Amino acid sequence: MSNQTYRDSEYLDGLSGEELFNLQIGLTYRDFLVLPGFIDFHPSEVELETRLTRNIKLKRPFISSPMDTVTESQMAIAQALMGGIGIIHYNNTIEEQVALVEKVKRFENGFITDPVILGPKNVIRDLDAIKERKGFTGIPVTEDGTRNSKLIGIVTNRDIDFEKNREITLDKVMTTNLITGKEGITLQDANEIIKKSKIGKLPIVDSQGKLVSLVSRSDLKKNKEFPDASKDERKRLRCGAAVSTLLESRDRVAALYEAGVDVIIIDSAQGNSNYQIEMIQFIKKEFKNLDIVAGNVVTRAQAENLIRAGADGLRIGMGPGSICITQDTMAVGRAQATAIYQTAKHSAKYDVPVIADGGISNIGDIANSLAIGASTCMMGFMFAGTTEAPGEYFYENGIRLKKYRGMASIEAMKAGGDKRYFNEGQKVKVAQGVSGSVVDRGSILNFIPYLSQGLRLSFQDMGYKSIPEIHKALRDGKLRFERRSESAQAQGSVHGLYSFSAPTMRAE
């Protein structure tokens, strides 16, 4: 038998991308499969590096959505550490959004830069409440109870365990003879001080004795290097922020720029508007080195207008999200896979990457979106149940859940989300989203490696080692697809079992 392997035109099955998406019917991720290619490499050889915009590269094609139940500073930090990026939502004041961005930009791995702090006149009962809510003690005490004031003590369990009167003020019980580290200390040196001194927390102070950050003994085992972290030229974590198209958002952009934001997402359900074009032009004129992702768009004409205005990246999707009802309510939008293919093909002429935004519920959806032209995937549903997402967990029927709501839900619009839908100031609100809950997914620091490994395995099955390779094969017609009938979709999922358990992730 011949050792020859067949990869090219002689034995092509299925359809090219052009043939698949010229069928004059809207397709979603479940409506097609990528046909397998030839494997001559290990999954570890697959590179997931990609571009967010013309100028910003990421080591992982994952972006957390600018939703108030998905991305604040904790999520953005975790995403950047793992090679992606988080986009801070704008259902807040300018000052609040800027503060969230600043937390990301000043983050140093292993240093707690926004520790819980109390003042000298707080009482032991306040510490009890923190322990119950957060699960830890060892709280720094500063002169006025804020981060940028002089450190005067620390309160630990040893100080308060046997104190019956929980109304005693902390200045009466706190430890004042403190071991501290000086601002600029390395994490390695800080850890050595903790080990030698046998203390639980090491406060880091500046030259004036003001609290800068905290290093915790409990984090010693958790701290690890993040070689794929998304960092700017000054080695700070990358972070994005969303703004609306309203005139008042120009002040928001200016403040975010001063805070060091890396990319602005102009957040609009229908991005093809004079409001968005004017916002793009304003940003490009005033902040020339600030990248812009415009959108949302689903057609080539929409993409053309925003690219001509100066967009560095495009966000694709109108109505595919799990909490979005735009297509049902407004009768406007487009099937997500078709939208990605058509806009990505057009945007590639200008070297503008596109983001697949919405409708992603598993690794297969991520792989499909990248295979048809997207460079990155923006996710809300997938990340909403993680530890780093805003909000507290709650239980329902024994299942651990977190709240997740669309930014066009009535609940979110009351908090300011209607700016995205040209609906601000209107007495009658028309919802284009819903509120719900999602199951606990654990930490982003464990979930992203799971998604990454699954994506590498998918790329291996396709026969390609990188996102640029797949995009080239798509353009050349070598990446082949097949439409799926309803019965094919049913057969490709779990079927015929009385019951089953389907764990999807296991860490060795």
From Swiss-Prot:
Its cofactor is K(+). Mycophenolic acid (MPA) is a non-competitive inhibitor that prevents formation of the closed enzyme conformation by binding to the same site as the amobile flap. In contrast, mizoribine monophosphate (MZP) is a competitive inhibitor that induces the closed conformation. MPA is a potent inhibitor of mammalian IMPDHs but a poor inhibitor of the bacterial enzymes. MZP is a more potent inhibitor of bacterial IMPDH. NAD(+) binds at D267, G317, M318, G319. GO terms for molecular function: IMP dehydrogenase activity; metal ion binding; nucleotide binding. The active site is at C324, R420. The keyword Oxidoreductase applies. Keywords: CBS domain, GMP biosynthesis, Metal-binding, NAD, Oxidoreductase, Potassium, Purine biosynthesis, Repeat. SMART domains: CBS (SM00116), IMPDH (SM01240). Residues 111-170, 174-230 form the CBS domain. K(+) binds at G319, G321, C324, G492. GO terms for biological process: GMP biosynthetic process; GTP biosynthetic process. Its EC number is 1.1.1.205. InterPro entries: Aldolase_TIM, CBS_dom, CBS_dom_sf, IMP_DH, IMP_DH/GMP_Rdtase_CS, IMP_DH_GMPRt. Pathway: Purine metabolism; XMP biosynthesis via de novo pathway; XMP from IMP: step 1/1. It catalyses: IMP + NAD(+) + H2O = XMP + NADH + H(+). It is an enzyme of class 1 (oxidoreductase). IMP binds at S322, D357, G358, G359, G380, F381, Y404, R405, G406, M407, A408, Q432. Belongs to the IMPDH/GMPR family. Homotetramer. Catalyzes the conversion of inosine 5'-phosphate (IMP) to xanthosine 5'-phosphate (XMP), the first committed and rate-limiting step in the de novo synthesis of guanine nucleotides, and therefore plays an important role in the regulation of cell growth. This is Inosine-5'-monophosphate dehydrogenase. It comes from Leptospira interrogans serogroup Icterohaemorrhagiae serovar Lai (strain 56601). The lineage of its organism: Bacteria, Pseudomonadati, Spirochaetota, Spirochaetia, Leptospirales.
